[in-house]
């Protein structure tokens, strides 16, 4: 039982399911930046190093937000607010993972890759968690930069540079992030209110939030389709798939305006995750064929 609790607690601290989406956004850059398929070792070490840095970010986030987490039903049983893991323990593990990540990426990949991953951590912990999230409804718009670094890491790992295609994928995720998290904030509105987080549904109301979700969904869809014209290796497979899933996401966002209920927001939230996975997988498949 003790070992089961240990693994469950650290699973909550490290958030591997969330990190898997970050890792998925690295893979297109690894393939697009290389004339030949990257080596298995380079792929593995880049993903492993990024996993460590992402996990460290989530640990520091939970250390900082422990008091607010205790006020939210969804987070009150997390290891730190419930007392199963101490702040000191979590901080030391976070520092160790952060340092290990930087070393692994700098030594076995290159310094630019390590700096990109570290910049994501700094952005998430300081810009988003400490400064923006408790202060503004636009917290996720600006603070979402941290979750967009995957493509930069992928391109940097192969070419030791950040070409325009890397930044276009960065911008794609940047535009995806607000709609995704505002949908989450709709069906967790009361909990965010209890924890005093000024999320958009709490401050501006659900109707305004659904209109903002629709607006960012359109911008994100334009960015997805535009990548076909920016990346010469993209073929009709990517164009067709991106058009189909973007149209469907647009329909869901419009339905959310018409029916702004938590269940509709939840449906949009989970589809947005699937959408980003599909886009990234299609980029790689189209490039390889």
From Swiss-Prot:
One of its GO terms (biological process) is heme biosynthetic process. GO terms for cellular component: plasma membrane. The chain crosses the membrane at residues 18-38, 40-60, 87-107, 111-131, 139-159, 168-188, 212-232, 234-254, 269-289. It comes from the Bacteria. GO terms for molecular function: protoheme IX farnesyltransferase activity. Pathway: Porphyrin-containing compound metabolism; heme O biosynthesis; heme O from protoheme: step 1/1. It is found in: Cell inner membrane. Keywords: Cell inner membrane, Cell membrane, Heme biosynthesis, Membrane, Transferase, Transmembrane, Transmembrane helix. It is a multi-pass membrane protein. It is an enzyme of class 2 (transferase). Its main location: membrane. It catalyses: heme b + (2E,6E)-farnesyl diphosphate + H2O = Fe(II)-heme o + diphosphate. NCBIfam families: cyoE_ctaB, PRK04375.1-2. Converts heme B (protoheme IX) to heme O by substitution of the vinyl group on carbon 2 of heme B porphyrin ring with a hydroxyethyl farnesyl side group. Belongs to the UbiA prenyltransferase family. Protoheme IX farnesyltransferase subfamily. Carbon 2 of the heme B porphyrin ring is defined according to the Fischer nomenclature. PANTHER family: 4-HYDROXYBENZOATE SOLANESYLTRANSFERASE (PTHR43448:SF7), PROTOHEME IX FARNESYLTRANSFERASE, MITOCHONDRIAL (PTHR43448). This is Protoheme IX farnesyltransferase. It comes from Leptospira interrogans serogroup Icterohaemorrhagiae serovar Lai (strain 56601). The gene is ctaB.
């Amino acid at each position: 039982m003790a070992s089961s609790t240990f693994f469950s607690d650290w699973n909550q601290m490290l958030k591997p399911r969330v990190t898997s989406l970050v890792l998925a956004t690295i893979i297109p850059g690894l393939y697009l930046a290389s004339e030949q398929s990257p080596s298995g070792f380079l792929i593995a070490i880049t993903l492993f190093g990024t996993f460590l840095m992402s996990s460290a970010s989530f640990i520091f986030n939970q250390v900082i937000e422990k008091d607010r987490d205790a006020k939210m039903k969804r987070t009150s049983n997390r290891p730190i607010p419930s007392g199963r893991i101490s702040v000191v323990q979590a901080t030391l593990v976070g520092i160790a993972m952060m340092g290990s990540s930087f070393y692994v990426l700098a030594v076995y990949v290159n310094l630019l890759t390590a700096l990109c991953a570290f910049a994501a951590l700094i952005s998430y912990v300081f810009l988003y968690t400490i400064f923006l999230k408790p202060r503004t409804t636009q917290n996720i718009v600006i603070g979402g930069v941290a979750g967009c670094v995957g493509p930069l890491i992928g391109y940097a790992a192969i070419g030791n540079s950040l070409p325009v295609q890397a930044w276009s994928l960065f911008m794609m995720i940047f535009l995806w992030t607000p709609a995704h998290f505002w949908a989450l904030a709709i069906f967790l509105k009361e909990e965010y209110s209890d924890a005093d987080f000024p999320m958009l549904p709490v401050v501006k109301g659900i109707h305004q939030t659904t209109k903002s979700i629709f607006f960012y969904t359109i911008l994100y869809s334009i960015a997805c389709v535009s990548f076909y014209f920016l990346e010469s290796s993209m073929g009709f497979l990517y164009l067709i798939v991106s058009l189909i899933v973007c149209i469907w996401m647009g329909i869901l966002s419009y339905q959310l305006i018409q029916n702004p209920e938590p269940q509709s927001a939840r449906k949009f939230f989970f589809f947005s995750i699937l959408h980003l996975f599909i886009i990234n997988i299609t980029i790689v498949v189209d490039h390889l064929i």
